Amino acid sequence: MSNTRINTLIIFIFTLTTTGFAMAYEEPKYNIVKTYQEFEIRKYDDRLAVEIEYSNEDSGFRYLFKYIAGANTNSDKIKMTVPVTQSVKIDMTTPVTQSVKNGKMLMQFFLPSKFTLENAPQPTDKRVSLVVIKGGHYAVIKYSGRLTNQNYLKHYKKLENNLNNNEIDFIKPGIRATYNGPFTLPFLRRNEIMMKITFDEENNN
C-alpha cells in the first residue's frame, strides 16, 4: 500500500471519530519491565481486537471503521482506541522474504477494555473478525515524524539491530502502531514499532 493511501486512510478515520485533537483515547494497558537506551520492553495482557486481512492493493481500513461505526450485530457505535496497528501475515511454509513480499497485511483496531469476546458485538461483514491478541513481551521503539515507509524501515532496522546486539530473540514481522490524528505536527507524533520477543524477566533485571 502506498504512503499516500496510508496517510489518506489515517486522515479518514481520525477526522470522522474526533471533534478535537487533544482528545484522550484508551490504549491497551502494559507494564514496562526494562528500559534500554533506544527501546523498551513491555508486558501486555490479552487484548481484544477487530481485525481484517487484506492485500497490499486493497486496504481493509474502511471495513474496520464501519464495524466501530455500527456495522455490527448490535448496531453499536464503539469508541475509538489507539493504536491502530498493521503487520504482515507470515506464511510459515514459505521463506520469510517471499511471504513478506507476497503476503497479506493485517490491520487491527483494539476494542475498549469493557468488551470481552463474549459481549462484544459481532461484525456483520464476514471479512472482519474479532480476535484475542495473546499477551506477552514486546520490544518497542518510539519515533516521531511522518508516517512513511522510509521512516518505518529506518526505525525497524534500528530495533532489529538493538535486539540482536542484546541477544534478545524476536519474532518477525514488526508491528506498526499509529497513535495520532492527521493534523498532529510531525515532531509531536507518537509512532511505534513493536516486536514480539522471548524474554525472561527474572534473569534480565
Q: What are these model-predicted stretches?
A:
Residues 2-6, 12-205:
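A solvent-exposed interaction/effector surface
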